[in-house]
Every structure is written in structure tokens, then in C-alpha cells.
Swiss-Prot record:
May inhibit PHR1 DNA-binding activity in a Pi-dependent manner. It comes from Arabidopsis thaliana. It is found in: Nucleus. GO terms for biological process: cellular response to hypoxia; cellular response to phosphate starvation. PANTHER family: SPX DOMAIN-CONTAINING PROTEIN 2 (PTHR45978:SF5), SPX DOMAIN-CONTAINING PROTEIN 3 (PTHR45978). Keywords: Nucleus. Coiled coil: none annotated. Residues 36-50 have a biased composition (Basic and acidic residues). GO terms for cellular component: nucleus. This is SPX domain-containing protein 2. It holds the Pfam family SPX. Induction: Up-regulated under phosphate starvation. Residues 1-162 form the SPX domain.
Length: 287
């Protein structure tokens, strides 16, 4: 599947309030088509070493109006990514602290624990979505710049991508830390997350709890209702699964690794089904 179609599908599946925050890939392609392909003799010459050390190194010199419009839109897109990403990160810092406070004050009522777990799962899913947002937009930029270089003969892709690597939206270290903190919270609150599936391994007791061990010391009193929450119906879950599917399609599209290749996500099991187990998502919902 072509990247444009994959991106379009992802935008349709994502959170409604996020849909206008992704790369305007179609608009960039339209601007690209307005440019007249340059013949070999009219293409920019590679700078010599002496030229590259000169004062006049403005990459926009010699560009047509259409090319300048394209570059301007790219810069606007970067600003859009950064603004949205930083805003989300700042919100997540506050939300994580509130969640930790909520967990610390939580009583052992079944309803309260179910609500806390759902909040953590949704928060985890939204952060994974933002990590994928970063990777998808990076990929889109690399692909549209490749098309630009091919059409104009210019060589702006490498310097532009080098700039992108330093942008806030591309830096997901803090997000990855938050994701792992959420997983750690779930493991502490609900040790049963470490098992494969409560419905497969556990036995319901007369009190409506689920027993996962043979020793009384290993009796995990998890509300049976908890295993029946259909997290796969969660909007966060649907969006996240869709995003991961798109990224898998993108990565499988080329076996060649280069400076422009999509960087791997931090190693936290996000690209396979193991991350679902970490947040206690049941793939086979109890009937």
C-alpha cells in the first residue's frame, strides 16, 4: 500500500481531535505537481568545496516560486508538529502525576480499581499513539522530500532531515519513559497482568474473584468484572492498533536501511502483541 493511502487510513482511525495535526501529505504532493520538472542542464549544480565555504550558501537561491511555496509549507508543517507534540507532552506530565496521586490514595474497592486501570490503559494508549504520530510524520517528510529532490534535482532532503532529527516532535525519550512508568504501575497494582490471560489461567472463586495461583499467598483478588472490560473497543486501542499496523506496512515496504530510514521505536514491545499484555488488554473478551 502506498504511504499516502496508509497515512490517510491512519488519520481516519485516530482520535478526532488529532486528525488535522498530521502531515498535509496530499497538499504537499499537489504543490509538487505544480513544479515543472527540471531538465538535467537546468538542475542546480553541486557546490564545490570552495563554493560551500562561501558566504552565499542560501539553499533557496535559484528556486522557483512553486519550490519556495513547497518549502514554506514544509516549515509550517514542522511548526505544527512541534506545537502539538510539546503541548501533548506537557499535558502528559500533569496527567501522570495526577494518576500517581490517584493510585496512592486509592482504596481497595473493585469499582475504583477498575476505573484506575482503565485510566492508565487509556493514558498508555494515547502516549503510544503520540510516539507513532512522531514516526509517521517523520516518514512522510522523508518520502515527500525524496519526491522533491527527484523532480527538481535539488538535494535538500539530507539537510532538512538532519534538521528534523533535532526537532521536539522527533524526540520521544520522555514519552517512552512515561509509557514504561504506566506499565510498571499496572504491574504493581494488578500482578495478574504478568500472566497470559486471566480467563485462560485463572479460576473464578465464589466471591467473584479470580485465583491465579495454587498457594493462598498467591491468591490475587482481581474483580472478575475487570477481565470483562472490552478494552479492544476503546478508541485509544483501535487507534493504536491501526497506527502500529501502518508502521509495520511502512517498514516492510523497503529492506534498504539508510539515513532516511524510519528509526526503530524504543524497545518496549510496542510493535508486537506483548505490549497489550503489559496493560492487561484481553484479546479474547470473556462472554
Amino acid at each position: 500500500m502506498k504511504f499516502g493511502k496508509s497515512l490517510s487510513n491512519q488519520i481516519e482511525e485516530t482520535l478526532p481531535e488529532w486528525r488535522d495535526k498530521f502531515l498535509s501529505y496530499k497538499e504537499l504532493k499537489k504543490k509538487l505537481k505544480l513544479m515543472e520538472p527540471r531538465s538535467v542542464e537546468n538542475r542546480p549544480n553541486k557546490r564545490s568545496r570552495s563554493d560551500s565555504n562561501s558566504v552565499d550558501t542560501d539553499p533557496t537561491v535559484g528556486m522557483t516560486k512553486e519550490e519556495l511555496d513547497f518549502i514554506s509549507l514544509l516549515e509550517d508543517e514542522l511548526e505544527k508538529f512541534n506545537s502539538f507534540f510539546v503541548e501533548q507532552e506537557e499535558e502528559y506530565i500533569i496527567r501522570l502525576k495526577e494518576l500517581k496521586d490517584q493510585v496512592a490514595k486509592a482504596k481497595n474497592s473493585n469499582e475504583e480499581m477498575i476505573n484506575i486501570k482503565k485510566e492508565i490503559v487509556d493514558f498508555h494508549g494515547e502516549m503510544v499513539l503520540l510516539m507513532n504520530y512522531s514516526a509517521l510524520n517523520y516518514t512522510g517528510l522523508a518520502k515527500i522530500l525524496k519526491k522533491y529532490d527527484k523532480r527538481t534535482g535539488a538535494l535538500i532532503r539530507l539537510p532538512f532531515i538532519q534538521k528534523v532529527l533535532q526537532e521536539p516532535f522527533f524526540t520521544t525519550d520522555l514519552l517512552n519513559t512515561f509509557v514504561k512508568e504506566c506499565e510498571a504501575m499496572l504491574d504493581r497494582l494488578f500482578p495478574s497482568n504478568k500472566s497470559r490471560n486471566l480467563d485462560e489461567e485463572g479460576e473464578p472463586t465464589t466471591s467473584g474473584m479470580v485465583k491465579t495461583g495454587t498457594d493462598d499467598s498467591e491468591l490475587l483478588r482481581v474483580p472478575k468484572e475487570l477481565s470483562e472490560i472490552e478494552y479492544m473497543e476503546s478508541l485509544y486501542m483501535k487507534s493504536t492498533v491501526s497506527a502500529l499496523k501502518v508502521l509495520k506496512e511502512i517498514r516492510s515496504g523497503s529492506s534498504t536501511v539508510s539515513v532516511f530510514s524510519l528509526p526503530p521505536l524504543p524497545a518496549s514491545g510496542l510493535e508486537d502483541d506483548s505490549w497489550k499484555k503489559k496493560v492487561g488488554v484481553l484479546e479474547q473478551v470473556a462472554k
